[in-house]
UniProtKB/Swiss-Prot annotation:
GO terms for biological process: DNA restriction-modification system. The type I restriction/modification system is composed of three polypeptides R, M and S. Type I restriction and modification enzymes are complex, multifunctional systems which require ATP, S-adenosyl methionine and magnesium as cofactors and, in addition to their endonucleolytic and methylase activities, are potent DNA-dependent ATPases. Keywords: ATP-binding, DNA-binding, Endonuclease, Helicase, Hydrolase, Nuclease, Nucleotide-binding, Restriction system. It comes from Methanocaldococcus jannaschii (strain ATCC 43067 / DSM 2661 / JAL-1 / JCM 10045 / NBRC 100440). InterPro entries: Helicase_ATP-bd (IPR014001), HsdR_RecA-like_helicase_dom_2 (IPR055180), P-loop_NTPase (IPR027417), Restrct_endonuc_type1_HsdR_N (IPR007409), Restrct_endonuc_typeI_HsdR (IPR004473), SWI2_SNF2 (IPR040980), Type-I_R_enzyme_R_subunit (IPR051268). This is Putative type I restriction enzyme MjaVIIP endonuclease subunit. Its EC number is 3.1.21.3. It catalyses: Endonucleolytic cleavage of DNA to give random double-stranded fragments with terminal 5'-phosphates, ATP is simultaneously hydrolyzed. One of its GO terms (molecular function) is helicase activity. Belongs to the HsdR family. It is an enzyme of class 3 (hydrolase). The restriction (R) subunit of a type I restriction enzyme that recognizes 5'-CAAN(7)TGG-3' and cleaves a random distance away. The R subunit is required for both endonuclease and ATPase activities but not for modification. After locating a non-methylated recognition site, the enzyme complex serves as a molecular motor that translocates DNA in an ATP-dependent manner until a collision occurs that triggers cleavage.
Length: 1075
C-alpha cells in the first residue's frame, strides 16, 4: 500500500536513492486507467478470475464481482467470492485495495492478502451520495461514484489504511476504508481549511454525526489529509478530549493506524507543563524559521488552564516575587530584563502559573525579538503599553502579543457538546486565535451558555453544521440499529399504579411524634417539602418499587436478551438506587436461575471516600472483600472490561458512568429507571444501537415515562435539519455572542461604578473592585475589611426596603449570569478576576440575607421511610400505545404565552406529529396528513397564516390521526388495508361520506399472496398487475351509483397508486421494489 501511496525508493548509485512514484496523484491525466474482464491471476488451489479488474498504470487496484441483480442476496455471494480470491491469490491483494460486489445490492469492501487462509471479517458498505432535488435533500446509492478516476485516487491516497492494535491481546492486522459519510465530512472539512488558508474568514466547523457512525476515524482522515497536504508548512494538530482515559485511548487508537508519517510525530501531552512546552515551541517557530514544530498531539481540554489551582498557588512560597516580576505598573524595559533573567529558572522549576502568565511571558520574548529585528515595531508596542494605565488592559495587550498567530494549526475536538464552553474553551481560543477548529458530536447542545452550534459553526450566517449524519441516516446504512421503545408502568393502564396512603394529617402526627421524643428539629416551610420529598426519593428510590421493577426485569430478561445472547443495562436514579437494584436483582436472579446468577449483575458507579449513605457504605465493604481491592476505580475498570469481553456480568447497573462514550456492541437492552433529558437521554439510549451478529434492534424499557421528552428532543434536533426552520431558529432563538459581550461589559462597568460610589445614610460603603483585584494578589491580603462592609450592606438591606441595595444585588446576579452566557468567548478571560470578586460579593450578601437553615438529615430520612411504608406499588405492565394529545395544544392556544414559546410550539408540534407517522407514510391517510402538514409548514414560513391558525390546524390533524388510529387499532393486516382504503375513498372521492368497503377480490388475492414464500421480481410484477385489476373491479362495483363518470377515471388512477404505494408496502415492506 505504501508503494501505491508514496512510491518505491530505489538505490541508483552506491550512495544515491531515488523515489519512483507508481501513481501521479497531482496530475491525474498522466496516469493510465483501464480494465479487463475475467483477467486470470495465479492462485492456489486454483487461479482467481474476478469479473472485472481495474488497473492504474498497469497495477490492479480494484476488482468487481458482478452477480444477477434479480437474485435475492446475490451481493452477499459476491462478497463471499471476493473473500475466496483473497485466500487463493493473496499476492494480488497486495495491490488491490478494495472490491465491489454488484448484485441485488451494491457494496464495496476493503481487501487484504489472506496468506494463512483464515476467516477474515472485513466490513462491506453502501456508497451513497447526497443531492438536492426540488429543494429537498435526497440520498441515493451510487457505487460508481468511487470509480471516478479523481475520486478513486483520493480514496487510495487518503481513505484506506491498515490497522494493527498493539495494545490488544491478538494484535490482529485489519484494513479500514472510509464510509461515504466520513469521506464527505472530510472533504467539507478540507474545503473549509483550504478556503481559510487562502484568505476566507471561516476557520471552524461542526461535524454532527450520530453515535456509532465512526467519528474517531473521520477525525483521523481529516488530520492525516491536512498533515500530508500542508506538510511543508510544518502543521500542528491537536486531538482534544475531556477525560484523561480518553486522552490515552485516543493516542492508542491513532497509533494503531499504520500511517508512518502520522505515527512518527504523534505524541501524548500528559501534563500541563508539556502543553506549555509545545505552545512555547510553536511561538518560537514564529520568530525563527530554523525551529520546526511539526507535530500531532492528544491532550485534554482541562490542561488549558487560566492559572494554577489554589493548592498549587498556596504551595508556591515565592508567590509574591513571581507576581512582582509580572507587575505591569513597572517600566516595560525593566520587566523584560527581569523576565529574561528568570525565564529559564521558572520553566525548569515549573512555576509558570497558568496559560495567562505563559502568554504574557511569550509576549516579552516576542518584544525582545522585535527589539533586535524590528526596532520600529518594538517602539510602537512599548508606546502603546505605556499609554495603557489600567493593568487589565496591559495584560490583554500582552496576551494578544504572546498568543500563537500561526494558521496551520488544526484542533479536532471530540464530544464537542461537553466541556468546551467556559474558561478552558476561552483559553484554548485566546491561545490559538487563528487555528482551524472542528467539533465532533452526535448530540449538540443549545442552552444559553452552552451552544454547540454557536461555538463551532456560524448559525448567524445560516450554517448550523458543516456536515450532518443523524439517526435516520445511520440506521438506513446499518451502521447503527433501530431502537424499540417500550413504556412500562406500575399497574394496568387505567390504575394508579402507585398510591401513597397518607395525608397531611399523617405527616403532622409524624412530626409531633418526633418532638415528643425530644429530637431537635428546625421549623420548615411547606414550600421546602418538594426539595426533600421529591419523585426520586419517594417513588424511584422506594425499596418496594425497586423490588417490583427488579422482579419485572428478571421475569423478562431472558426473552429480552434472547437467552442471554446479548447483555443488558439498568439505569438507576442515583447511586443509592444502584445499590438497591443490585440487592434486588441478585435475589430474583438467584431464585430463577440458581446460585451462579449472583455474579450476573454488577454496579459501575462513583464511590466517595467520605460516604454518608449507610447502604452504600455496606456495599463498598462487600465489594472490596469480593474483589480483594481497595481501589474502586480499578474495580470499575475490571467490571467494565468483563462486561465487554466475558460472559459475566450479563447486567450492568449504572446511574451516570457509562451512559456516554461506552461502546458495547453486545448490549441490547436498557432498563431506564432514571429521568434523563435532552442530549443526555439521546446519548444514553444510543448505548444499545451498536451492530452485533444477529442483533436486529436495541430495546429501551422505560419505567419513568420519558417518551414525550424523547419525542420533543428528537423534534428539536430534526428541526435543525430543515432549512426554513433553521432560518426561523436563527432569527428567533440565536443571540449574537458579540451583542451579549457588549451587554456584559456595560453591565459590569455599571455594577463596578455602583459599588465604588455606594453610600448609605452618609456612611461610606464603597468597594473599589479594581483596587481589590490588585490587593488580593498580595499574600498578606486580609479580607476582613471587605466583609465588614458587606455585613453593613446586608444589614441595611435586611428589611427588604432599601431599593438601591436590592437593585445592586439583582445587577450583580445579572452580570454573573451574562458572563456565564458568554460560554468560551475568548475575551471573557480578561474579566475572570472581576467576576471572581463580584461572585464572592454576591454570594456573601445572599448568604447573609437568605441564610440556609440546617436540615436535620435523620428527620428527612425517617420521614421518607415513613412515606415508603405507606406506599402501595402494583406490578409493572407494558403500555403498548402512545397517543398524541391535542389537548396540550388547546392549552397553548388559550393561554397568553410569549412569542418565543409560540415559535417553539410551532416547530415542536410539527415534528411531534410528523415523527409519529413518518415510518407509516405509505398508508394513504397518514400520507395525506403529512402532505397537509407540509403545506401548513410552508404557509406559515411564507407568512400566509399566523401562529394560531397554524396551531389550530395542527390540532385538527392530530385529532384526525388519533381517530384513524382508533379505527385500525388491533386489526389484522388485511382489515387495516380495507379500513384505510374505505376512509380514504370516503374523504377524497365521496367527500367526507362514511363507507365500509368489502373489497372481496382484493382480499382473496392478498390472502393468497401471504401464504406464498418469496417471489421473484417477475412474479411480483405479475401479482402487482393482478392486484391492481382486482382492486379496480372491487371499487367500481361497490361505488356504482355513488360516483359520477368523471370520478371513475380518478378511481382507476387511484387503484394503481394504492396498490404500489400502499398495499404492497404493507405486505412486503417499504423497500419491496429493491428486494
Amino acid at each position: 500500500m505504501d508503494y501505491l501511496k508514496y512510491g518505491i525508493e530505489v538505490v541508483v548509485k552506491k550512495s544515491e536513492k531515488r523515489k519512483f512514484k507508481l501513481i501521479d496523484y497531482k496530475n491525474i491525466d498522466k496516469n493510465t486507467f483501464f480494465y479487463l474482464c475475467e483477467a486470470e491471476f495465479k492462485g492456489n488451489p486454483k487461479n482467481s478470475r474476478p469479473d472485472i479488474t481495474l488497473f492504474i498504470n498497469g497495477i490492479p487496484v480494484v476488482i468487481i464481482e458482478a452477480k444477477a441483480t434479480l437474485k435475492i442476496d446475490s451481493h452477499l455471494e459476491g462478497i463471499s467470492q471476493i473473500r475466496r480470491y483473497e485466500k487463493f491469490s493473496p499476492d494480488l491483494f497486495r495491490f488491490v485495495q478494495f472490491a465491489i460486489s454488484y448484485g441485488e445490492e451494491q457494496l464495496y469492501t476493503p481487501t487484504m492478502p489472506n496468506w494463512y487462509k483464515e476467516n477474515i471479517h472485513l466490513p462491506a458498505y453502501y456508497w451513497r451520495i447526497r443531492q438536492k432535488i426540488n429543494g429537498k435533500k435526497v440520498v441515493k446509492d451510487d457505487i460508481f461514484y468511487i470509480l471516478n478516476p479523481s475520486i478513486l485516487l483520493e480514496i487510495i491516497r487518503y481513505f484506506i489504511f491498515y490497522r494493527k492494535d498493539e495494545y490488544s491481546k491478538t494484535k490482529t492486522l485489519s484494513k479500514i476504508i472510509a464510509r461515504y459519510n466520513q469521506y464527505f465530512a472530510t472533504k467539507k472539512a478540507m474545503k473549509r481549511i483550504d478556503e481559510y488558508l487562502s484568505g476566507d474568514s471561516k476557520n471552524k466547523g461542526l461535524i454532527w454525526h450520530w453515535q456509532g457512525s465512526g467519528k474517531t476515524y473521520t477525525m483521523f482522515f481529516i488530520a492525516n489529509y491536512f498533515l500530508d497536504k500542508y506538510f511543508s508548512e510544518n502543521p500542528v494538530i491537536f486531538f482534544v478530549v475531556d477525560r484523561v482515559d480518553l486522552e490515552r485511548q485516543s493516542k492508542e487508537f491513532y497509533e494503531a493506524i499504520q500511517e508512518k508519517k502520522f505515527k512518527t510525530i504523534l505524541k501524548r501531552i500528559d501534563s500541563i507543563n508539556k502543553l506549555y512546552e509545545v505552545i512555547k515551541s510553536i511561538k518560537m517557530s514564529e520568530l525563527s524559521n530554523k525551529v520546526i514544530v511539526r507535530g500531532i498531539y492528544t491532550t485534554t481540554i482541562q490542561k488549558f488552564q487560566y492559572e494554577r489551582s489554589k493548592k498549587e498557588k498556596d504551595n508556591n512560597k515565592e508567590k509574591d516575587k513571581d507576581d512582582e516580576d509580572l507587575d505591569l505598573s513597572k517600566p516595560i524595559e525593566e520587566i523584560i530584563k527581569k523576565i529574561e533573567d528568570k525565564l529559564k529558572k521558572e520553566e525548569k522549576e515549573g512555576k509558570i502559573k497558568g496559560l495567562k502568565d505563559l502568554l504574557i511571558i511569550l509576549a516579552f520574548i516576542y518584544l525582545k525579538h522585535l527589539k533586535e529585528k524590528n526596532p520600529e515595531e518594538y517602539k510602537k508596542h512599548i508606546e502603546n503599553l505605556k499609554k495603557l494605565k489600567d493593568k487589565d488592559k496591559k495584560e490583554e495587550y500582552l496576551i494578544n502579543l504572546g498568543n500563537i498567530k500561526r494558521k496551520h494549526i488544526l484542533i479536532l475536538i471530540d464530544e464537542a457538546h461537553r466541556t468546551q464552553y467556559g474558561i478552558l474553551g476561552g483559553m484554548r481560543k485566546i491561545t490559538f486565535p487563528n487555528a482551524i477548529t472542528f467539533g465532533f458530536t452526535g448530540t449538540p447542545v443549545f442552552k444559553n451558555e452552552k451552544n454547540t452550534f454557536t461555538e463551532f459553526s456560524y448559525p448567524e450566517k445560516g450554517e448550523f453544521y458543516l456536515d450532518v449524519y443523524f439517526i435516520g441516516d445511520s440506521i438506513k446504512d446499518k451502521f447503527t440499529l433501530p431502537l424499540t421503545y417500550q413504556i412500562v408502568k406500575e399497574g394496568d393502564i387505567k390504575s394508579e399504579g402507585i398510591q401513597i396512603t397518607l395525608d397531611e394529617e399523617d405527616i403532622k402526627e409524624f412530626i409531633d411524634e418526633w418532638i415528643k421524643r425530644g429530637e431537635d428539629i428546625n421549623l420548615f416551610d411547606r414550600k421546602k417539602l418538594p426539595k426533600y420529598i421529591n419523585k426520586s426519593k419517594t417513588i424511584l428510590l422506594n425499596p418496594k418499587r425497586i423490588d417490583k421493577v427488579a422482579k419485572y426485569i428478571v421475569d423478562r430478561i431472558e426473552e429480552d436478551t434472547e437467552n442471554f445472547k446479548f447483555k443488558a443495562m439498568v439505569v438507576a436514579v442515583n447511586r443509592l438506587g444502584c445499590v438497591r437494584f443490585k440487592k434486588a436483582l441478585d435475589k430474583y436472579l438467584k431464585e430463577k436461575f440458581g446460585d451462579e446468577a449472583e455474579k450476573w449483575a454488577e454496579v459501575v458507579m462513583t464511590y466517595h471516600h467520605n460516604e454518608e449513605e449507610k447502604e452504600i457504605i455496606e456495599y463498598m465493604k462487600k465489594l472490596k472483600k469480593e474483589r480483594n481491592s481497595n481501589d474502586f476505580n480499578e474495580i470499575n475498570q475490571i467490571i467494565r472490561e468483563e462486561f465487554l469481553n466475558s460472559e459475566n456480568p450479563k447486567i450492568l447497573i449504572v446511574t451516570d458512568m457509562l451512559l456516554t462514550g461506552f461502546d458495547a456492541p453486545r448490549l441490547k437492552v436498557m432498563y431506564l429507571d432514571k429521568p434523563l433529558y435532552g442530549h443526555r437521554l439521546l446519548q444514553a439510549i444510543a448505548r444499545t444501537n451498536r451492530p452485533y451478529p444477529d442483533k436486529e434492534f436495541g430495546l429501551i424499557v422505560d419505567s419513568v415515562g420519558l417518551f414525550k421528552v424523547l419525542t420533543e428532543t428528537m423534534a428539536l434536533y430534526n428541526m435543525l435539519a430543515e432549512e426554513e426552520i433553521r432560518e426561523d431558529f436563527k432569527n428567533n432563538l440565536i443571540s449574537s455572542i458579540d451583542e451579549i459581550f457588549q451587554e456584559f461589559k456595560l453591565k459590569l462597568e455599571m455594577v463596578k461604578e455602583s459599588l465604588k460610589n455606594l453610600k448609605i445614610n452618609d456612611e461610606d460603603l464603597s468597594i473599589d473592585v479594581n483596587t481589590l483585584k490588585t490587593l488580593t494578589k498580595n499574600k498578606d491580603f486580609n479580607n476582613n475589611e471587605l466583609k465588614e462592609k458587606l455585613d453593613l450592606i446586608a444589614f441595611y438591606a435586611e428589611d427588604g426596603k432599601n431599593a438601591r441595595i436590592l437593585k445592586l444585588i439583582d445587577d450583580l446576579k445579572a452580570v454573573i449570569k451574562l458572563y456565564k452566557a458568554l460560554g468560551s468567548y475568548p475575551q471573557k478571560i480578561f474579566y475572570i478576576e472581576d467576576i471572581e470578586l463580584l461572585s464572592f460579593i454576591y454570594a456573601y450578601l445572599i448568604k447573609k440575607l437568605k441564610p440556609k437553615k440546617k436540615s436535620n438529615r435523620k428527620f428527612w430520612e425517617e420521614l421518607i421511610s415513613f412515606i415508603h411504608n405507606k406506599m402501595l406499588v402494583d406490578d409493572l405492565t407494558v403500555i403498548e400505545e402512545i397517543n398524541l394529545n391535542p389537548d396540550d395544544l388547546d392549552k397553548i392556544l388559550k393561554e397568553n404565552i410569549g412569542k418565543r414559546e409560540i415559535k417553539r410550539a410551532v416547530a415542536n408540534y410539527y415534528f411531534i406529529l410528523k415523527n409519529s407517522i413518518l415510518d407509516k407514510q405509505h398508508d394513504p391517510i397518514y400520507k395525506e396528513i403529512l402532505e397537509r402538514l407540509e403545506r401548513l409548514r410552508r404557509d406559515w414560513i411564507m407568512k400566509r397564516i399566523d401562529d394560531k391558525i397554524y396551531l389550530n390546524a395542527i390540532k385538527n390533524l392530530m385529532e384526525l390521526k388519533n381517530n384513524y388510529d382508533k379505527k385500525i387499532k388491533g386489526k389484522s393486516s388485511i382489515e387495516r388495508i380495507k379500513e384505510s382504503i374505505s376512509t380514504y375513498i370516503g374523504e377524497n372521492i365521496l367527500k367526507d361520506q362514511d363507507i365500509k368497503l368489502n373489497l372481496e377480490n382484493t382480499e382473496k388475492l392478498i390472502t393468497k399472496m401471504q401464504n406464498l414464500n418469496k417471489l421473484s421480481k417477475l412474479q411480483r410484477k405479475k401479482f402487482k398487475k393482478e392486484l391492481s385489476c382486482a382492486l379496480l373491479e372491487d371499487l367500481l362495483k361497490e361505488l356504482k351509483g355513488k360516483i359520477k363518470d368523471e370520478d371513475a377515471k380518478k378511481v382507476a388512477e387511484l387503484s394503481d397508486n394504492l396498490v404500489s404505494e400502499f398495499i404492497l408496502k404493507e405486505i412486503w415492506g417499504e423497500n419491496y421494489e429493491n428486494q
